[in-house]
Amino acid sequence: PVTRCRDTGALAIEASTAAQRGGVISKVRDIEAFGVFYALDQIRMWKGLHKSNGLADYVGQWFAGKVPQSVLMRPQRAVGMVLEVMLDKLNAPAIEAGTPQLDLCVTHDMTIFTMRQGAGLEPVTGPDVRFMDGLLMYERDNKVFFASQHGGIVEVDDALMGYAR
């Protein structure tokens, strides 16, 4: 993962500790599923990105099937894989039994664009990804939802999770 992503996670933990918000403060650790794991040929990906009209445009090309699968895996598969990891974290027992827990996962701008487009939250032509933009997975009324700070919300159901298979 990019150093600045790790630094962002550390800053969030430091701010929470300084505010004395309570709870368990864990350390920053790398989880490959929040990196750009879907890039199968980094050199060709960066060359394609450099020739595009920016990151959102490149992600749009990827979803339109204009980026070879030898460069980037199918975007739907990447979306499904990230959702699987997030769902597993949501369903995992709390570090301290009986206490609420929040997992803060920092990722790359490309993954935010990918998840918003692929899950149907917002198209890549929608809001740009900015520092500290976020996505949220939560449970309400025995259903799991995936949401964007820009207002898009989808239920994490079998159809959406089917991308991972």
What annotation goes with each model-predicted range?
Residues 1-60:
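Phosphate-coordination/substrate-recognition cap region in phosphate-metabolizing enzymes
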Residues 8-20, 82-94, 115, 119, ...:
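Hydrophobic, Leu/Ile/Phe/Ala-enriched alpha-helical segments that form helix-helix packing faces
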Residues 18, 22, 33-48, 96-101, ...:
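Acidic, low-complexity terminal tails and accessory targeting/binding regions
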Residues 48-55, 70-81, 144, 154:
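General structural signal for secondary-structure boundaries
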Residues 55-78, 160-165:
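Extended, charge-rich low-complexity interaction segments
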Residues 65-102:
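A mid-sequence, solvent-exposed acidic-amphipathic segment
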